[in-house]
Amino acid sequence: TIGGEVNFDPSYNGNILVNAMAVGLANSDRIFRAAATGPGNPVIYVGAKTGRDGIHGATMASAEFSDETESKRPTVQVGDPFTGKLLMEACLELMASDSVIAIQDMGAAGLTSSSVEMASKGGLGMEMDLDLVPAREEGMSAYELMLSESQERMLMVLKPDATDTARQICETWDLDFMPIGKVTDTGRLVLLKDGETACDIPLAPLVDDAPEYDRPQADVPARPILASADVAKGTTIGDALVNLLASVDLASRRWIYEQYDSQVMADTIAPPGGDAGLVRVHGSQRGIAVITDCTPRYVEADPRTGGAQAVAEAWRNPSAIGARGLAITNNLNFGNPEKPDIMAQLAQSVLGMGDAARILDTPVVSGNVSLYNETDGRAILPCPVVGMVGTIDDIASAVGMAPTGDGQALVVIGQDASQDDGWLGVSLY
């Protein structure tokens, strides 16, 4: 764990957000995708067994909470990091053995999303026998097997002559390996259960042809700018500084990041606590910079500017240690989009993020969405988290935050709030 960010606000008390960003390295000519190809090729289930945990986990994540709905929370699945590590190593070995045609994890909506998306991306169909799905509970229905979100599971399409090799690899890593179906050319999803057809539907309406929401947006004006000259000066600069330093929003995050190992494999160059985390590409002098950023109070005050600011800050932080940003990802955390004011926050934030990405010539390569973050009708502060990855050619040229000698100059770059047209930008002050 080499970096991160923490924000506090009472609106998160009922919906605590945890956004995680994982970054890895891959050979550009050995990237495996999720498009199923080859009618007749076997569809393989790999990983942990399927249980009833996590059923409707995605649905639960798309609902407001209240005291009456508190009982829904236990539907969230429980991860098993050790099994996850075994599954990761097995997948890498399977890929190295040239057995894999397509692969996708079973995330939200479990086997439903992975099978439908893989078949759709390949322009084909899929048939599966749910009686063959490894289950850890008895009597699971087709509905439960398809919607379970039990963790540490993968769905793969393998080369027909590679099944035995793949089975041996998975058994070596103590993982379930089960052929549960095949790729078809029908453009349909067919599910068998107890010897009967439980489902036979076209794929297109579930994926590309699914209806899109066009929700109404409220006209929410941005907050008026408060000029620095208009701020009451009821306290001394010293008292103001003490109050700011006592704020949880500015206090050290050491109590959080020291609970995690930031030095695994001894390649960490810039540990947590700086502008960006920096790790060495193992066995080389190149480095990868990683950062996540968002200031929710900015987004609440002006969604479009706040969304742009999240991208801009994520872009600035790698440059502050000497790295050059490559691309961003995002996780859009908002309240109930069925409410016009929340939908306006979401839409305007995305527009602002796009504005900044185009100006900075930065691609957005992936993303995630977490909506309906409300409890008893109170929405969270809008929080479009932006993750940035950058590179540095020589880690020896990386720059830290600490001064390195006496007499060095302190320089402020950018607009100064003390200027005539300066403003405090929703600062904590």
Q: Where are these predicted regions, by residue range?
A:
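Glycine/proline-enriched, intrinsically flexible loops and inter-domain linkers
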Residues: I2-Y429
